[in-house]
Curated annotation (Swiss-Prot):
One of its GO terms (biological process) is photosynthesis. TPR repeats lie at residues 35-68, 72-105, 120-153. This is Photosystem I assembly protein Ycf3. Belongs to the Ycf3 family.
Length: 169
């Protein structure tokens, strides 16, 4: 049974209904519609924690999607799945690919910063303050870029940047 017919969550059902309407009324090439269907099913599976299924759908959407902007969101979501699975190196690869296609994707910059910050915290726990500082500096760079694109967002990151003296360096 297609995922679009299995949604139990109200938000997922609403998204699916709206997506189905858009697929019918917006003129698209057949490949674009199919790519969007896989993307939609990937998002639905991801929201339910079905990460393997989400990845299968996203990879299929990537195979079919030709628009770089749309591909950036698929790549971003693949990165999210890898982040959720604790595969931070893979996640970073996908966030970077998303940013190559769409440099104005603050959420990819934010998630990249979060991973850098996490790695900085790991370095502190391992007794390596120099490596930690390098990771924190990297996190600061990505957060500043994200904040520049979305000034009203990432308040915790803005506070961290101010508290640590990294804001505007």
């Amino acid at each position: 049974m297609p995922r679009s017919q299995r949604n139990d969550n109200f938000i997922d059902k609403t998204f699916t209904i709206i997506a189905d309407i858009l697929l019918r009324i917006i003129p698209m090439a057949p490949g674009e519609k199919e790519a969007f269907t896989y993307y939609r099913d990937g998002m639905s599976a991801q929201s339910e924690g079905e990460y393997a299924e989400a990845l299968q759908n996203y990879y299929e959407a990537m195979r079919l999607e030709t628009d770089p902007y749309d591909r950036s969101y698929i790549l971003y979501n693949i990165g999210l799945v890898h982040t959720s699975n604790g595969e931070h190196t893979k996640a970073l690869e996908y966030y970077f690919q998303a940013l190559e296609r769409n440099p104005s994707l603050p959420q990819a910059l934010n998630n990249t910063a979060l991973i850098c910050h996490y790695r900085g915290e790991q370095a502190i726990r391992q007794g390596d303050p120099e490596t930690a500082e390098a990771w924190f500096d990297q996190a600061a760079e990505y957060w500043e870029q994200a904040i520049a694109l979305a000034p009203g967002n990432y308040i915790e990151a803005q506070n961290w940047l101010k508290i640590t003296g990294r804001f505007g360096e």
